[in-house]
UniProtKB/Swiss-Prot annotation:
Biological process (GO), any one: glycogen biosynthetic process
Gene name tied to this protein: glgA1
Keywords: Glycogen biosynthesis, Glycosyltransferase, Transferase
Residues where ADP-alpha-D-glucose binds: 15
Name this polypeptide is given: Glycogen synthase 1
EC number: 2.4.1.21
Molecular functions (GO terms): alpha-1,4-glucan glucosyltransferase (ADP-glucose donor) activity; alpha-1,4-glucan glucosyltransferase (UDP-glucose donor) activity
Amino acid sequence: MYIVMITPECAPIAKVGGLGDVVQGLSNELSIRGNTVELILPKYDCMRYERIWGLEKTHNNLWVPYHDQWIPCDVYFGFAEGLKCFFIEPHNGFFQRGTYYGQPDDPQRFAFFCKAALEFMLRSNKYPEIIHCHDWQTGLVPVLLFEQYKYLGMTHPRVCYTLHNMRHQGVTGGHILQQVGLDPAAYMTPERLLDHTYPHGVNLMKGGIVFSNFITTVSPRYLDEIRYTDQGYGLQHTLHEHSQKLGGILNGVDYKVWNPDIDPYIAARYNLKTLDKKYENKTALRHRLWLRDEYKPIVGVISRLDPQKGVELIRHALFYCLANGCQFVLLGASASNSINADFWYLKQYLNDDPDCHLEIGYDEDLAHQIYAGADMLIVPSIYEPCGLTQMIAMKYGTVPIVRHVGGLADTVFDANYAHKPYHERNGFVFHDFNHEGIEAALHRAIGLWYEYPQYFRELMENGMRYDFSWNHPGQHYLNIYHHIQEI
């Protein structure tokens, strides 16, 4: 099958969050299964070009109709982690901003990218069976495909559209439709792209939902949450109207990258049969971070310091752990200056504490070493479409402590959860987003570590037995692709 991913991100070359990991992991899995997979991305000036092999310009005469003019573009080709990638570089500087997102004209930038991606496919005679789009940034692709490019000969492709985070929907003014050649009066209706909140607004994510052949979310639980709770951020009715083409598929983890048995970044490699070597990594982590060697559990956090990720509870857990016989390690940073400043203050305040280390930023080596050396990992999110950290932690025998939301609820089952056999229980879960909730979960986890280490080890082993690879999600997506081909 010939599949084209149109995406704003792909790890490791252009990654802001989990979306980039998903695109890379799923594309690799589909390629391994014998499919032809190509990716189309913007050519950001801030990409990690050192991770792109064989980058060369392949087209320098792609003219894209946009806003009553023709914008010239160059197209480059290269390999990223073995994946075939095309990068579109418009001459108007849309993607020469030193950042991926966060610009006032982001809707215009990515509306243009949607148009340019389809124009490139048309002009280069690419007719895939499946176009797979991701989040609001590519929401206009199915709209333009079925309302414009179908009549130019692109009648074959079917579109799968994945919702990674409903919090960001690409809401903008109606003028954007005119800029890409669509009549605002025809598309700014409640059944099409009209936003639910702003009476004169266009919702790009809604366009993707309405016009795609199938929509997926990144976990089954998140699908329920966005349909039936305020996590749909106003699109609940639209999702209900299109419920016949909705499905939730749990993301996978790339075990070529996140696997303690082959991990080049950790002090001692190990697997389920050699789990005792994990403690060598605990010692190495302490030495790297200048933590004292004591008989204490290490509680880790690897996270964006974003309100969604539960920074308030992370901060509270830090002091609770230090007061209750634990060491605490954090790796993370925030796009918010105030949150960063808060954690920098905490870092300075706790600088002389031999049981605590806060690393403000992101360090790939250290992330691997925390997964390998920590005993527990906290993920106290307000909402979590899927979450990868808890699944990675389990592969490393690190017991997750999570809030019961989204993909966390689909992957972590409490040590006391009576509806699961004991060998399927793999962590600690709390429900209420408050201090009492996370304290109760930490109290149980810390108590088990100290008082019943043999039972704690069973949780570690249970987690390591779970298969969160891309094998099952890859097959689910192929089933969807085959299904929508018949439409």
